[in-house]
C-alpha cells in the first residue's frame, strides 16, 4: 500500500531447543501504521462528533520478547513494547466534574495522539499441575505501563485458574470433566464504551475490578455426543455485592445457567 495510509511491518523470531523438555524463544517486532479511520475522520449529525485529523502521525511500535517453555516448569514469557504516537479516545479538557457526575462524559469524547513514548511491559506464566485425575491449570499475568500521561490503562495483575476432574464413568461409557474456573484482575481505570463511535475510550475517574469471577462447569461425552452445563458468575448469588461492571455504566452479567448439546450424525 502506498500513500498517506502506507505502513510497514517486520517480525522475526528464533527458537533454541535446550533439551527434550526445555525451549528458549526470542522475537522482535517493528510496525508503523496509520490510525484507524475513526481517529482520522468522523462525520455525523451530532455537532460535537465531526472531525478530520490530518496531522495525526503513524503509530510506531517496537517490541522485543523472550520465552522459556518447559514441560516440567511451565511457560514463562516477557514482552516489552515502546509505542510512539499512541492514538486513543478520551474526554476533552473542558469537561467539568458536574458533567462527570451527571454521566455526560460521552458528549466530550474526542480522538487524541500521545506525543510521549508509552512503555508497556507484560510478563506471563502458564503451568498446569496434574495429579491422578485432577488438574489445575494456571495463567498469571503481570503488566506495567510507564507513561507521562495516563493514556493506556491495564490491570497490573490478572489470573485465570481452572481446577477440574476428568474420568471415564459408567464402565467407560461416558467421559466426564467437571470443575471450577476462577478469574480475577486488580482494580484499574477500565476503558469506557462509546455507543455512537463504537469504540472504547480512556477514562481516569473511576476504578473497576478487584472482584472474582467463579464458574462451575460439567462437560460430558458419550460416543459422538457432547454435553455441557455451566453455571456462570456463581459468586454473584453467594454475596450481597451487586456492583459488577464489564465497563463503566455497563453492568456485568448476573448468574446464569448455560446448557448445550452437540450431536454429530454419521452416515
Give the residues covered by each predicted segment:
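Exposed, low-structure sequence patches enriched in small/polar residues
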Residues: 1-267
